Each structure stands twice: as C-alpha cells, then as structure tokens.
Amino acid sequence: MSAAAAGRGERLNHAGNPGHRSKYSRVLLKLGGEMFGGGQVGLDLDVVAQVARQIAEVVRGGVQVAVVIGGGNFFRGAQLQQRGMERTRSDYMGMLGTVMNSLALQDFLEKEGIATRVQTAITMGQVAEPYLPLRAVRHLEKGRVVIFGAGMGLPYFSTDTTAAQRALEIGADVVLMAKAVDGVFVEDPRVNPEAELLTAISHREVIDRGLRVADATAFSLCMDNGMPILVFNLLTNGNIARAVAGEKIGTLVTT
C-alpha cells in the first residue's frame, strides 16, 4: 500500500461508523465493456445493476472507488478498422461507447444511494464533467464514485492503458482489473479448461510471456511506476469487496 494510502487510515462510512478494514483505501476498478453487454451488443441492465451493487458495498465500507469502463459492447476501434473503417474515427466511436456505459453505471449507482460523477476526456458538458484529476480526487475524498469515460481522449490508446494512467494520476493503491475469468492463466482457459491459474506474477513476466490479460502498454506503465494490478472474476458476486479486502482471489501482478 502506498504511503498516501497508509496516511488515509481506516475510513468512516456514510453513517459515521468505522468501515470494514480493507487492504486498499483508493482503488481504480477497470471494467470490460463486453461484460456490460452480457456478450451481446448493447447493455445488459441486470449485469450493470449487479456491478453497481458490488461497488456500492465497498463504498459504504469507506473505500474510495474510481472506475474506467471499456466500450466493447458497442464498438471496438481495432475491429472496425479491420472492416475497413479509418482507425482514428473508429477509436473515437469506441470512446463514445465508453461514455454510454459510464452513464448507465452512474444511474444504477445513484439508485443504490451512491453519489457518482462521470468525467470524460472529451468535453461533453451536458452529460459529464471534463476530466480534471484534482477534482476527481476531491470527489473521491467526499465519498463519491468517479467514472472516467471516453478513454484517454486519444486514438490508439486502450481503456486498459487509460485505467493504468488514471490510477497513477489519482494516487490509487491498485488497479482492480475485472474480467470474465478467474485471473491470469498460462493458457486461454476458454480453449484449455485445464489451464493453470497463476496466483502471483510480475509485470515483466506478463509482458515477456505474452499473456493476454491486458495490453502491454498498460502493464509497462504499471511496472515502471510500481502500480500493482489484481486480475479477478467480476461475475462472482462479492468479488469486488473480496479484492478490496485483500482476500486471495485472482492474480496479483506486482513489480
């Protein structure tokens, strides 16, 4: 845990009572857009509601939560490029998809009674705040969830890289990378159900072995700055709280 996190100490929940003890005080949660669609194009509102309930649980326990969501349930820039679209334009379409996901999650979090702000890297003042890291930190300190939409606002950068960069800029303790699998495997578990799950690994080894968890740029950025990544299964209810508490789930990636 960072020195800043240690200084924050045990936080109070909204009722003024000591929150559950957590390993991390401020986390960046990375959500894949494809999970928001339940494997289809568009939004699966049952999935969004379940994710919102899990996030609300840890926020009530006093943990500061920022979120980055992909847009793969609407558009994936690289795939659109393969179909003949110009890459820059298709990436911007993907960024707009992340904003739609961000607004949906904001709505369900607020239904859970959690104050939530969306900040976007592309200015769209009628629906979200602009991305301002100092303001984002102030929101977090006040117990609000902050969702970062529109990726980096630049083509050719994935939302995985956005998650790493935003985590560093807001002083998060860890990137919680939520997936539809239990963690990092030596092989694709969808191809080989007997593939070995790694409980711990270094950033360098992930990059050198070409393990396809997230893009190499995101892992390199975290490696260079000592940012741990916990890869875990979002589809198991309660796993966000388990991850924040430091329970042994998923795969912990460290320098």
UniProtKB/Swiss-Prot annotation:
ATP binds at residues 30-33, 72, 76, 185, 188. GO terms for molecular function: ATP binding; UMP kinase activity. Inhibited by UTP. Residues 1-21 are annotated as: Disordered. This is Uridylate kinase. Pathway: Pyrimidine metabolism; CTP biosynthesis via de novo pathway; UDP from UMP (UMPK route): step 1/1. InterPro entries: AceGlu_kinase-like_sf, Asp/Glu/Uridylate_kinase, Uridylate_kinase, Uridylate_kinase_bac. It is an enzyme of class 2 (transferase). Its EC number is 2.7.4.22. The lineage of its organism: Bacteria, Bacillati, Actinomycetota, Actinomycetes, Mycobacteriales. HAMAP family: PyrH_B. UMP binds at residues 71, 91, 152-159. Keywords: ATP-binding, Cytoplasm, Kinase, Nucleotide-binding, Pyrimidine biosynthesis, Transferase. GO terms for biological process: 'de novo' CTP biosynthetic process; UDP biosynthetic process. Catalyzes the reversible phosphorylation of UMP to UDP. Belongs to the UMP kinase family. Homohexamer. It is found in: Cytoplasm. One of its GO terms (cellular component) is cytoplasm.
